[in-house]
C-alpha cells in the first residue's frame, strides 16, 4: 500500500517540476543572441503565364524588361511588336534566416508593381535576390500561390482577397551564405525583444541559479552579458541550448492598445485605474426627407410643384454613472463598462477620457 502512494507522489512532483512556474517563458522566446539575425533580400522579376490579367502596354518598364529578357535568351524582338497582357513586372522579397546554408530553400513574396489585375496562375521567372550589400544571395523561380481571384468585364468586376500579391513556398534557392559563426570565446551577449529591467534581472538570476555560478550580468534593460564556463568555451553550442531552455516569468509595462479603425482593444493584466466615475451616453440623429406633391385647387392659376419634406429626430440614451474604485483589475474594468452597455468604440473613448483625467495607471497606445 505504501509503494503506490510513494509512486504517485513522485509522479506528481515530476509533473509540477516539468510544468515550471505559472506564466513562465523560455529565454529563447523573449531574447536572442546578438549577431544571430535574418537578412532581407529583394529582387526585380517577371511573372508570366497570366490569362490576360498582366500589365498593359502603357507600362513601359514591363515591355522593356521582357524585350531584354528575350534578347538574353537569343531571341530578337521589336519593342513595338511586344504585348504584355500575360506578363507582369514584380518585386520579389525574402528573408534569409541565420545559418542558412547553400542549397537550402526559403519562401519568397511576389508583389506587382505595374497595373496588372491579377497574378493568379502566373509563374515567376528566374530572379536574383540581392542583399543590402548588392551581392546575390538567392535565386527565386516557380509558380505562385495567390489565394485570391479577380474576374470582371468593362462594367463590373468581382474580387476576393488580394490578387496582385502571391507567395512561393520554398521558391528561392540559397546561393551564398552569410558569413557568421560562433567562435570560441568567453562571453555571450543577449538582447531582449521587449526591454525591461525586471525581466532582464530575472533572466540573470535564473541563469546564475541554474549553473550555480555568477555567469550572467544585466548591462541595461535590454541586454545581458553571459560568461561561458571555461570547460565549455570550446563547444558553446551545448551551453547555449541549455541556457535558452531555462524558464522565467517576463514582466511588462501595463498597456492598453486600441485601434480606432477596427474597434479592437487589447489590455494587459496589470492595468489599474484610480477611483473614477464614468458616464457615457449615445447621441442618435435620424434625418429623413420625402418629396411631397403640392396640388393647386381646381380652376386656379397655381402650378403643381414638388415640395421636400424634411424631418429630424434627435434622441440621447441615458448615460449610466458607474464608479470604479482605486486599484481595480482589468476584469473589474471590463465588467463595469459592459454593465453600462459600452461598445468597443465606446470603450476607446472612455479609456481616452480616463487617461486624460489622470486615473489610468497604464500606457494608452492608439493605432
UniProtKB/Swiss-Prot annotation:
Compartment(s) of residence: Periplasm; Bacterial flagellum basal body
GO BP terms in the entry: bacterial-type flagellum-dependent cell motility
Keyword list, A-Z: Bacterial flagellum, Periplasm, Signal
GO MF, one annotated term: structural molecule activity
Record's signal peptide: 1-24
GO cellular component: bacterial-type flagellum basal body, distal rod, P ring; outer membrane-bounded periplasmic space
Subunit structure: The basal body constitutes a major portion of the flagellar organelle and consists of four rings (L,P,S, and M) mounted on a central rod.
Function: Assembles around the rod to form the L-ring and probably protects the motor/basal body from shearing forces during rotation.
HAMAP family: FlgI (MF_00416)
Family recorded in the similarity comment: Belongs to the FlgI family.
Name of the protein described by the UniProt record: Flagellar P-ring protein
